[in-house]
C-alpha cells in the first residue's frame, strides 16, 4: 500500500505492560489496512525484551501486510490512555509537557498508564514527524452528574487526592451509543441507552442523549461488574480484614482483587468458552462463577433502568457481549415486566454485525453492537487535528 488512493490513515496504538496492539485505519471509511498484536513483552526468553522492540516488531508486521508508513498517508498516531484524571478528558496532542503531566497522574492508574506512556515515548521517537494524540478512556465520563461521580467519603480528602468516579471504556461506550442510534435511524440526542461492554474487563453505562448519567467503573477499573480477573464491587473492609487477619499487604490484596478474582478467582478460568465447557460438564465452581457474573450484571441493568427513568435501548458489546448468546439471555430474562422482551430466534450465537435481538413489540429495544475503539480513536485524532 503506497497511499496513492489518497486516504488519510491513523496508526492506533494500545500499549499494555506485556502486549502492544496496533491498527492502521482510515478514519473516514473505517477500513483497517493492517491490525495486529505483539505479545510477551519483557517476558523471560521472549524475543521482545521491551516496548522499543515491540513497536519495531509491529512495524515489521505492518510491512508484512504491504504497508510502508512513509507512504501510507499517515496523518497521526493515536494512543489509548486509560486515565486522564481531572486534567485530560478531551483528545490531546502529545508534547513533552503533556507527557510529564501524564507521568504525574500514573498513581491513579499504576497498572495501565505507565505502559501506555512507554508506548508513547517509543512511538514519538520512532515516528518523530507525525502528530501523536492521546485519547482517554475516562474522557467520555468526565461530566458525570455530581451525584454519580462523587464518593461519600471525607470531602477534603477526596478533593485533595482527586478521588471520584472516573469511569472507563469511555471510547467504547460513546462509539456504541452512536452506532445504536444509527442502527435504529433515530437521533442520538433523543435516546436513553444502557451500554454493556462485556469483555475480559466489563463495564456498564447509562446514557441520555450524548451525556452519560452513570457508569459502573470508578476511581479505577476495579469497581462495578464482575470481570475476568477483577472482583468488581466489594466491601472495602475486605482489604483491611485480609491485611489484619491473613497478614497480607495492601499491594498483595490489590493484586489479588485485580488479577486473581472475578471469574478466574471463582472458577480457575477466565475464558467464557472454557467456562461454558466446565458448566456443561457439571463443574459447580464454574456454575457459581457464571451465576455471580450474571447476577451482578442484572443488578446494574435494573439500577440503570431506574437512573434513566425511561430506557429506549440496551446494547451488548465487546467479546462476551457480542458473542455469548447465553450471557445476553440470562442478563435480561424475566424482565418482561420492565419492558425487555428478548427474541430467542434472533439471539443467536455466531451471528455477526449490529443486530436487534429483542422482539418487535419489546418496549425496550435490545441490540448487539460491535465496538470499534480503534476507529473511534482514529476519528478523534483527525477531529482534534482539525481534519
UniProtKB/Swiss-Prot annotation:
Tell me which domain of life the UniProt entry assigns to the organism this sequence originates from: Bacteria
Which cofactor(s) does the record list? Mg(2+); Mn(2+)
Which residues are annotated as active site? 137
Q: Where does Mg(2+) bind?
A: 14, 373
Q: Which GO terms describe its biological process?
A: acetate metabolic process; acetyl-CoA biosynthetic process
Please name the pathway. Answer: Metabolic intermediate biosynthesis; acetyl-CoA biosynthesis; acetyl-CoA from acetate: step 1/2
Q: How is this protein annotated for GO cellular component?
A: cytoplasm
One Pfam family this sequence matches = Acetate_kinase
Q: Where is this site: Transition state stabilizer?
A: 169, 230
Task: Tell me a Gene Ontology molecular-function term this record carries.
Answer: ATP binding
Cofactor binding description:
Mg(2+). Can also accept Mn(2+).
Any idea which positions bind ATP? 21, 197-201, 271-273, 319-323
Residues bound to substrate: 80
Its Enzyme Commission number(s) read: 2.7.2.1
Could you tell me which HAMAP family the record lists for this protein?
Answer: Acetate_kinase (MF_00020)
Say what the protein does.
Catalyzes the formation of acetyl phosphate from acetate and ATP. Can also catalyze the reverse reaction.
* Protein family per UniProt: Belongs to the acetokinase family.
Subunit comment: Homodimer.
Report the protein name in the record: Acetate kinase
Can you name the source organism? Mycobacterium avium (strain 104)
